[in-house]
From Swiss-Prot:
The keyword Methyltransferase is annotated on this UniProt entry: no
Keywords of the record: Membrane, Transmembrane, Transmembrane helix
Extent of the signal sequence: none
Membrane topology: Single-pass membrane protein
Cellular localization per UniProt: Membrane
Pfam families: ROH1-like
InterPro entries: ROH1-like
TM segment ranges: 205-221
UniProt organism field: Oryza sativa subsp. indica
Source domain of life: Eukaryota
Family: Belongs to the ROH1 family.
The protein's name: UPF0496 protein 4
């Protein structure tokens, strides 16, 4: 029946694109056209939002949060579309139900794996917070004892982030399976069914690709990335293919080295933790060297002091012996008065001169030993203390800067992980709610069918 003259123009000014999308004579009503166009426009807009200015931004927690928000919005939209289509579950083909239930349960498994990994990384924050708490000091510079207490926590945290999560490794095979099963199912005798399958193909393609990015980034491996190319007949194909090309090339390049910690916020904290570990070890070695030098200097002083005391005792002994000899000579000279007073006085003068000479010699030697001690002490101080003080001061400044950087990076990582974990949990609930709603409607439909059979 031909269209009457003056009737309204077509909704599409350059022809109906859905004739290409739905070959075989399937015609969409204006309502269905508007529903599908609105859904696919929103899908294309979300994909354009996900395309970062720099491809490396997909390695950040902030981009991952944006991606989960987009997925949540798209899955909410598909639920609304199913409602607006007014397509009861009783009219669904068994294959449609199987596709939806199979893909949704695998998607839930992936969400659980992602949540588990984020939770594991978040628990590691306790180790970082403890280490930073131990390193905190009113004077600013942590002591050697504080460094020793913090070192095991830093080492344990680095070991934790260096381990690949087994659940994420298993997700790679699941994602590849989902990507391999993606196809636009042929639907006969149901225009609404064709719209539904087209919408499901779009959301599954985007979900699988985004989830593969998450798994690749968190596992530090490009293997989970799926290879997809959406045909041009889909209105959102250009946005999807542009995002896929940019992100896949960048991730493959970034993850080629096999680094486990691929998230930028995580890498920043790890770099600070490694540097802090090195500085703590260096500071410990420097302090041990300084203590050893001080011990050697103290030992030398004690040995020198003991030597001087022993030499002084020896000289005093000589002096005492000489005085005793002199007294004996005086007694003998006095007892032999018959030999002459002049000879006795000569002996007395000679003995006195010997005593004076001995005292002068001892005084001179002690003065020389004192000069040697002062010279050695000054040389040791200039050789050990001054250079060490400069080296230790530089190490302490670098240590404080590293602690400050790690504190800021750890705080950013904590907020990022908490926010992303919450969003992944919300997305899990959206998928689970949609799946439960379908199962509930199936049970109601089956019950109604059985009642109808009994009634008939």
């Amino acid at each position: 029946m031909s269209r009457a003259h003056g009737s309204p123009r077509s909704f599409f000014p350059v022809g109906n694109p859905f004739r290409v999308m739905f070959p075989g004579g399937a015609h969409l009503s204006r309502k269905l056209q508007e529903l599908l166009a609105s859904y696919e426009d929103a899908l294309a807009l979300s994909l354009r939002k996900l395309k970062p200015e720099a491809a490396s931004d997909v390695l950040t927690l902030s981009w991952m949060r944006l991606a989960v928000d987009c997925l949540s919005e798209l899955h909410t939209n598909i639920a609304n579309l199913i409602t607006d289509l007014e397509l009861p579950v009783s009219d669904w083909d068994d294959k449609w139900v199987d596709i939806y239930l199979n893909s949704s349960v695998k998607l839930l498994d992936i969400c659980i794996a992602l949540s588990s990994e984020l939770s594991r990384l978040d628990q590691g924050q306790l180790l970082l917070q403890y280490a930073l708490h131990v390193l905190g000091s009113e004077s600013g510079v942590p002591s050697q004892e504080q460094l020793k207490r913090a070192e095991p926590s830093l080492r344990e945290w680095m070991e934790l982030v260096g381990v690949r999560c087994p659940r994420l490794v298993s997700c790679s095979a699941t994602l590849q399976e989902l990507a391999g099963n993606l196809s636009l199912m042929k639907v006969k005798n149901s225009v609404k069914g064709k719209v539904l399958m087209r919408a499901l193909y779009g959301i599954e393609s985007v979900t699988v690709f985004v989830c593969s990015i998450f798994v690749a980034v968190l596992s530090g491996s490009p293997k989970p990335l799926v290879e997809l190319h959406v045909p041009e007949k889909f209105g959102w194909s250009q946005a999807f293919n542009d995002l896929h090309t940019a992100v896949s090339e960048e991730l493959t390049r970034q993850l080629a080295g096999g680094s486990v910690a691929a998230v930028k916020e995580l890498e920043e904290v790890e770099a600070c933790a490694k540097r802090l570990h090195v500085l703590a070890s260096t500071s410990q070695l420097e302090e041990e060297a300084a203590n050893l030098a001080n011990a050697v200097s103290h030992t030398e002083e004690e040995v020198m002091s003991d030597s001087i005391v022993q030499e002084g005792d020896h000289h005093c002994g000589l002096k005492l012996a000489d005085d005793t000899t002199r007294e004996c000579e005086v007694v003998i000279s006095e007892s032999i008065a018959e030999e002459g007073t002049h000879e006795a006085e000569m002996k007395k003068d000679i003995s006195y001169e010997k005593g004076v000479a001995m005292v002068e010699r001892i005084s001179y030697e002690e003065h020389q030993d004192s000069n040697v001690k002062q010279a050695n002490g000054s040389s040791d101080e200039s050789a050990l203390v001054v250079p060490e003080r400069t080296s230790v001061q530089e190490s302490k400044e670098e240590l404080l800067n590293c602690i400050s950087s790690m504190s800021k990076s750890a705080e950013g990582l904590r907020h990022g992980l908490d926010s992303l974990s919450k969003r992944v949990g919300d997305f899990f609930q959206i998928v689970l709610t949609g799946r439960d709603a379908l199962l509930c409607n199936l049970r109601i439909s089956d019950a109604a069918s059985k009642v109808a059979e009994v009634s008939s």
